[in-house]
């Protein structure tokens, strides 16, 4: 990774994700987290102000040194204890199976190289009654938008840190062994190929579960 990926892209990412619309969406979902939380792709820590007092600890995973540096600063004002893990989400997480009450990922799954493997790690660490809270952009339902998502994704991955515009977020979550219990989809303000959003909650499923 070069200078752009290490130093420029993290600042662009922080700025792009720090606006009224994303703050509104964060405020709708992040307070639903409870107990021990794993935030996958914590980035610069923009979710931290939205965690409720019912969160005891947040484990924040991210591979970017620069984004974690920004997150450390925001963690100082967080209501919960925050511990950072610098690694990719699909790597084996140094957390015990069934030790996490809530997994949170916002605008993250698009950029994980091996998304199915990362989701398996999330499922592994969740308790049986745990929840996955997700806010992700991905493949739109409209053919005229999908055409552009497919055309732009190869270039977008190069300039956007591996971000895919065309991933089917709900299908990825279900295929990893989750049941989606709440799902809202919509276009957020902005260019449609980049802004179709999946927001919701999922729970892990197991063979024989009711």
How would you label these PLM feature ranges?
Residues 116-128:
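A short glycine-rich, Lys/Arg-flanked "PGG" loop and its adjoining helix->strand segment in the class I
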Residues 38-40, 44-92:
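Class I SAM-dependent methyltransferase SAM/SAH-binding core
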Residues 185-210:
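Core SAM-dependent methyltransferase catalytic element
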Residues 161-177:
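Short alpha-helix
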Residues 101-114:
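A short SAM/SAH-binding and catalytic strip from SAM-dependent methyltransferases
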Residues 16-36, 46-47:
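Conserved alpha-helix/loop element of class I SAM-dependent methyltransferases that forms part
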Residues 129-137:
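Conserved beta-strand signature within the Rossmann-like core of class I S-adenosyl-L-methionine
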Residues 90-102:
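A short acidic, Gly/Pro-enriched loop at the edge of an enzyme's catalytic core
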